[in-house]
């Protein structure tokens, strides 16, 4: 929130480029939640922009900085001109270096489980005997680029899945290498072009439908349920 405030509300950058920059470096990045968070800060949905002065930042980050351009009260901060330190805006050129992989070896007698950047769960259909493929689609990473560190993190996480093989290419290219086996994959907005049996994601609040109002009203309505579901008990603590 602080970064978005400085980049957009004070630095006068459009939210999209710095949001892409942040997503590029997030190991656990999710473009949807990241982009919406930046839009919330800049007031895209309410015309109310988020701002934070030095006192606020010191309090929530346990720092004691002073004499900065943010070291003013909120009335002055709301009228503050863009400081020289934030006036230069970079034209981002973000690219992703995808891994070099070996030819995959498919057992034609077994179904295929497709994993990707957004699903690397080692418990998903863990009991099933299957070909397990990590599908890395260049078009996805061209549209939503990530850093070398993110790709490395993905590859390390994939090692938790026994027998997984890596395929760099699009879904239809992978399909041509199969022999008509049943394909399974997890639901995700970027998987709409997949073909096969789709497993629905686990939802924090499964029966949440027709959501209306603000985030905070939704949170208040479901706060106790969420806390109860994720409460650690006994030897989990």
Indicate where each model-derived feature is located:
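C-terminal catalytic domain of photolyase/cryptochrome flavoproteins
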Residues: 4-177, 191-192, 210-237
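Non-catalytic terminal regions of proteins
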Residues: 172, 184-186, 198-199, 203-205, ...
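Extended, well-folded catalytic/binding cores that form a central cleft or groove in large enzyme
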Residues: 176-179, 201
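Acidic beta-strand-to-loop metal/phosphate-binding motif
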Residues: 178-195
